[in-house]
Regions:
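A conserved acidic beta->alpha catalytic loop
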Residues: 60-62
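Conserved alpha/beta core of the MobA/IspD/sugar-nucleotide pyrophosphorylase nucleotidyltransferase superfamily
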Residues: 2-7, 157-261
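ATP-binding glycine-rich loop module of kinase domains
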Residues: 269-274
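Conserved beta-loop-beta/alpha segment of the NTase-like Rossmann-fold superfamily
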Residues: 65-135
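Conserved core of the sugar-phosphate nucleotidyltransferase
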Residues: 110-185
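N-terminal nucleotide-binding beta1-loop-alpha1 segment
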Residues: 1-23, 72
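A short, N-terminal amphipathic alpha-helix
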Residues: 35-52, 92
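Short acidic/polar active-site loop segments enriched in Thr and Asp
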Residues: 5, 51, 98
Length: 274
């Protein structure tokens, strides 16, 4: 068994699909069922014995400053969050990666998935019955991931936390350093880089039940999980819109981000009864 050294929580992205709530507050800092998403994750890590936690910030980074005093975490700012994909967040913490959890700040774990010790590198997965647009994993007889494809049916797909052992961390950061200034890397997720080198970056699939790990890409999805958001969106933008239209917040739904050609969010659209 391998002792977990630390955890990295990725919280740099703008989460444009979560508009308009993400315009006012970083998605990682919204309250779900009475707990702030990232605070719940930090507590779960601490309960598992993982004390050394790094939070990579970018968009609305100032909103995370209170976490230092409240939880004693380390904040690391990713100044390239708006021009590069999430591989840049891995790059800014490359010197602390060893036997490390890599977490998404906006995941909600129904139960604590973290441990003080792990067997080896893994990526968490949820099973999809029928078709999914998610990143689907294929494994060998020993459980190692040998292929990943976007979209699939009756398959295990990537969702949740990841664990990198020291060997994985060392080789991944070497590959990242070697390719960091290449023009074609800018838009790549760290997962893209992993898949390109999947033969040498050994990682197993760790399977979870569908009701264990949750992710909310839109306000509509959040409402399905936390019904308190149906009547109270906690958004001053939506409260003003509802008042202007003479409706209650529950009648505003079907939220979609409107994006420019460079994929930058420029607004949002929604459906309103009547």
């Amino acid at each position: 068994m391998i002792k977990v050294d630390n955890a990295v929580i990725l919280a740099a992205g703008a989460s444009s699909r979560f508009a308009p709530l993400s315009y006012e507050r970083h998605k990682a800092l919204i309250e779900v069922k009475g707990e702030v998403l990232i605070e719940r994750q930090i507590r779960q890590l601490r309960e598992a014995g993982v004390k050394d936690i790094y939070v990579v910030t970018g968009y609305k980074s100032e909103q995370f400053s209170y976490l230092v005093e409240k939880f004693g975490v380390n904040l690391v700012h990713n100044s390239e969050y708006a021009t590069r994909n999430n591989h840049s967040s891995i790059h800014v913490v490359r010197d602390v990666l060893s036997n490390s959890y890599i977490c998404s700040a906006d995941n909600y774990f129904a139960e604590n998935p973290f441990n003080a010790y792990e067997e080896g590198a893994f990526y968490s997965g949820i099973y999809s019955e029928g078709y999914t647009k998610e990143w689907c994993m294929e494994t060998d007889d020993e459980g190692y991931i040998i292929d990943v494809k976007i979209g699939g049916s009756d398959a295990w797909y990537m969702l949740g936390h990841v664990f990198w052992d020291e060997k994985f961390s060392k080789r991944f950061t070497e590959i990242l350093e070697q390719s960091y200034n290449a023009p074609d890397i800018v838009d790549k997720l760290w997962e893209d880089i992993y898949i390109e080198h999947i033969q040498e970056l050994k990682m197993k699939l760790k399977k979870y039940d569908a009701d264990y790990i949750f992710e909310f890409d839109t306000l509509d999805e959040l409402r399905e999980f936390d019904s308190s958001y149906v009547r109270d969106t906690r958004s001053s933008i939506l409260k003003d819109i509802a008042e202007s239209l003479g409706v209650n917040e529950a009648e505003l739904k079907g939220f979609q981000a409107v994006k420019a050609v460079d994929n930058r969010a420029t607004g949002f659209k929604f459906v309103c009864k009547g």
